[in-house]
Amino acid sequence: MRYAIMVTGAAYGTQQASSALQFAHALLNEGHELASVFFYREGVYNANLLTSPASDEYDLVRAWQKLNTQHGVALNICVAAALRRGIIDETEAGRLGLPSANLQPGFTLSGLGALAEASLTCDRVVQF
């Protein structure tokens, strides 16, 4: 089956993002296709390059990036939610006159159209 995941919880402070990542790995291990992960609302914090967990904590942000590089899973974050929460890429930083970007490599700023497309092209969309 072809799946998409929507994550609405931040990388730390809730169980949503880590549960979503575990579910993503379980899907891939069982031979399913994971087309994309869409980060919405507080979920956009999963794409913050500046997140720096303690050395004895799991680095969830880099784990998402690893999912992208190893399995080619698209990591889309809602551009409107991201901008409201201070997550920006180089293009938006330049457009807004900000000194730097903080979007983790592997993630892409996207509109809700990416979520709509995933809903139309996947057999299941699972929200965390």
Curated annotation (Swiss-Prot):
What is the recorded name of this protein? Sulfurtransferase TusD
One of the entry's Gene Ontology molecular-function terms is: sulfur carrier activity
Domain of life according to the entry: Bacteria
- What positions does UniProt annotate as the active site of this protein? 78
Cell location: Cytoplasm
GO biological process, alphabetically ordered = tRNA wobble position uridine thiolation
Q: Which GO terms describe its cellular component?
A: sulfurtransferase complex
Keyword tRNA processing listed: yes
The family assignment reads: Belongs to the DsrE/TusD family.
